[in-house]
Design a protein with these regions (language model features):
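Basic, amphipathic alpha-helical recognition segments used for DNA target recognition
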Residues: 88
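N-terminal secretory/targeting leader peptides
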Residues: 1-82, 91-305
Length: 305
């Protein structure tokens, strides 16, 4: 975030001629992350880089958010941009948030989702008994194939693995680097389960409605650049990690084959989408439409029949 959020703030300030200034506060400085949503609704916070994933229990469109999708729906940044920007998933999320007093600026990449381990995980069958820190639908996937997933704050993950409480963890790749998890997990498993993991920019509707049209345009234009920059930085730094850092860290990269990818897609991801369509989509037409869009996209890409 240090590579992209300060430049976004600077761009808004410069393009607005100093009329619109955003003050940066990092996670937890103003409110706990679960309080971001109500704080935006109340206009206590005006803008946040957050995710509907965190509130999928109370925000039905959270089930459509990129970080909550099961593995191998999107397999490239181009897939993500096609699905969210062109086929209408961002539109559906934005409509759902608008009803809850949130103006939605859109989804963006925060890097690809992988997992890593103390021991080699060479195939899907090796997941049995694997104790792993993951999140959302990734936890559901792990459990389906015999692993034992838990949810744990990122700063606690290193010690849990070092002490043997966990065998590994998974999330956006850069946390493997930033938390030095390569010191306790020398095996990095791919391909990425989510390409990419996503987050979103939310604005308090009250704050957004108070902006004149020219400043709204400034924020929207800066958001487009923010999305591009975030994706570019994540991609460049991930490539550097694979090309250079793995050797320095002593990391072994293990990439599963097509059979395992197809098996996850067929045995878990598609049934997961069908379940969401049935259980959530039956109550919320936006979710039903979104799941239909996602499945048609996967068919068009040849990922499912």
């Amino acid at each position: 975030t240090t590579y992209v959020i300060p430049p976004f703030i600077d761009m808004v300030r410069e393009k607005s001629g100093g009329r619109l200034n955003i003050t940066l506060h990092y996670a937890g400085e103003l409110v706990d992350y679960l309080e971001v949503f109500p704080s935006l609704q109340a206009n206590m916070i005006q803008i946040s880089n957050t995710s509907t994933l965190f509130w999928r229990g109370s925000l039905n469109v959270g089930w459509l958010q990129a970080g909550n999708l099961p593995p191998f729906v999107c397999r490239s940044l181009e897939d993500f941009e096609e699905l969210y920007y062109k086929r209408g998933i961002d539109r559906l999320i934005g409509e759902g948030l608008a009803e809850r007093d949130i103006h939605f600026l859109g989804s963006h990449s925060v890097g690809n989702t992988y997992f890593w381990s103390k021991k080699p995980i060479n195939t899907l069958d090796d997941l049995k008994g694997f104790k792993v820190r993951f999140f959302g639908a990734m936890n559901d996937t792990m459990e389906h194939f015999g692993a034992s997933p838990v949810m744990l704050p990122h700063p606690e993950t290193y010690m849990a693995i070092a002490m043997g409480t966990l065998d590994g963890s998974g999330t956006a790749w850069w946390l493997y680097r930033d938390l030095k998890l390569y010191e306790v997990c020398p095996y990095f498993i791919g391909p990425a389960w989510q390409v990419p993991q996503g987050m979103e920019l939310w604005v308090s509707k009250k704050a957004w409605d108070a902006l004149p049209d020219d400043l709204k345009k400034v924020v929207e234009e800066a958001t487009v650049e923010f999305n591009k920059t975030f994706a570019k930085v994540c991609d460049e730094q991930e490539k550097e990690m694979f090309a250079k850092s793995f050797k320095e860290w002593g990391t072994t990269y293990i990439e599963w084959g097509k059979d395992d990818i197809d098996r996850i897609t067929k045995e878990f991801s598609l049934p997961f989408l069908n379940k969401i369509e049935q259980e959530i989509g039956s109550k919320d037409p936006r979710v039903a439409e979104g799941i239909q869009i996602i499945k048609q996209f996967m068919k068009d890409r040849g990922y499912i029949n």
